[in-house]
């Protein structure tokens, strides 16, 4: 517990001109040394980027609370670790608020298809991080050894497996990094960013507040790009 909480807020500029507010609550102990004093900046930048790039944020407020959990998201409110600083605080903030798009706006079934939740979110997080403050916190996905484990380890279950059918130690690779990297390859090496981004925006637009399956995603991208993804 803390003797005092700091409340900070800033206007979020949405493409349509609608109003939204970034609101942060954190204990005074989390302030300073590139800590939570930048939290409102992070939330504002994250939501403005996703709103302009993909689909407008639908809620009148975006609340982040410093807490004793590493990161947990709900519509319009997130809880992030009170000890996080710098790139770690940006990363968890951007990730948890990214979940407002997947699976809040696009309501895929995260219990069956985790890659359509965590994987899609991890994918858009990297693009957001590249654009934030001229890439202040952008890093590569990891070492060659990490990528080998994430992409080519023969002991990994299929990405399409449900989380219940994955070994717990594999969930990070299968739900987050492998699908995110696959989308990156699809965007940058196969389709091209310009065409892919148009198709991905259309996918979000078509399936906003609905419950798409993997086939719905594949079909939408194929229809919008004219490419066969088989």
Predicted regions, residues:
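Loop/turn elements at helix/coil->beta-strand transitions in domains of secreted/extracellular proteins
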Residues: 18-21, 56-62, 98, 191-196, ...
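Active-site-adjacent structural elements in folded domains
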Residues: 63-65, 84-88, 162-171, 184, ...
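Amphipathic alpha-helical substructures
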Residues: 172-230
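Active-site-adjacent bridging/hinge elements
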Residues: 18-19, 70, 95-100, 148-163
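Second-shell loop/turn segments in exported
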Residues: 28-37, 79, 83, 110-111, ...
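Zinc-dependent metallopeptidase catalytic helix centered on the HExxH motif
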Residues: 37, 79-143, 200
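Acidic/His/Gly-enriched intrinsically disordered linker/tail segments
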Residues: 112, 118-189
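Hydrophobic helix-coil surface modules that form long, contiguous segments used
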Residues: 1-94, 123
């Amino acid at each position: 517990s803390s003797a005092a909480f700091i409340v900070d807020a800033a206007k979020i500029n949405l493409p349509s001109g609608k109003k939204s507010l970034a609101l942060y609550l954190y204990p005074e102990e989390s302030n300073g040394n590139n800590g939570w004093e930048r939290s409102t900046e992070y939330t504002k930048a994250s939501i403005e980027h996703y709103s302009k790039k993909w689909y407008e944020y639908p809620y009148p407020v975006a609340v982040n609370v410093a807490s004793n959990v590493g990161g947990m998201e709900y519509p319009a409110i997130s809880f992030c670790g009170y000890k996080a600083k710098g790139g770690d605080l940006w990363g968890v903030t951007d990730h948890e608020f990214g979940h407002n798009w997947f699976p809040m706006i696009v309501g895929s079934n995260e219990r069956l298809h985790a890659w359509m939740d965590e994987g899609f979110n991890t994918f858009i997080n990297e693009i957001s991080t590249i654009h934030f403050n001229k890439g202040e916190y952008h890093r590569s996905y990891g070492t060659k050894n990490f990528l080998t484990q994430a992409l080519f380890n023969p002991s990994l279950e299929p990405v399409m497996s449900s989380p219940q059918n994955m070994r717990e130690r594999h969930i990070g690779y299968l739900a987050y990094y492998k699908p995110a990297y696959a989308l990156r390859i699809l965007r940058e090496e196969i389709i091209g960013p310009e065409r892919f981004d148009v198709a991905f925006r259309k996918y979000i637009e078509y399936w906003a507040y609905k419950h798409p399956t993997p086939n719905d995603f594949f079909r939408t991208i194929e229809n919008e790009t004219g490419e066969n993804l088989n």
